[in-house]
């Protein structure tokens, strides 16, 4: 079975706009218009059996809509993660909702959500995710949305992991997109944690 562990698709109401913004920012031509249906068509073309669907709440008000949509996509070809926003006052309730929906983890994107991965204000959120026994996947390394400020460097990720050694952490982009040199060192130092690089 082939599973793509990092898939982005969007609610049809926002898919076209989201993909356009990402294309302008990254300079990368997308393979779909960002819908779940087109993504599944590409899975078929490329021999992919399932994909881990990762959606980002870029505003606190988006959490519930995104999580309910991700739950609708879950099963079949998608293994859906939910999303919370660090500025949402109701993050604990939303984590409980994610768990109730049967979603498989939580996606956080430090660049799009405006936090450093090792920021102390995130500790209570990481503790709540750990209590819910859910894995959390982070964008890590470079992102075109904030090219001059990397919100999740390998060193910062390691700082966070040391404070939360029981948190099930997945660092996307092999631990640091376009920052390959420090990744192996960080990974070796974090060997006693629940750290996974995808």
Spell out what each predicted region is:
Residues 49-50, 60-152:
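Active-site gating/metal-coordination segments in enzymes
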Residues 15, 148-155, 179-185:
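Histidine/acidic-residue-rich catalytic or RNA/ligand-binding cores of hydrolases
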Residues 186-193:
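Conserved small/polar residues in nucleotide/adenosyl-binding loops
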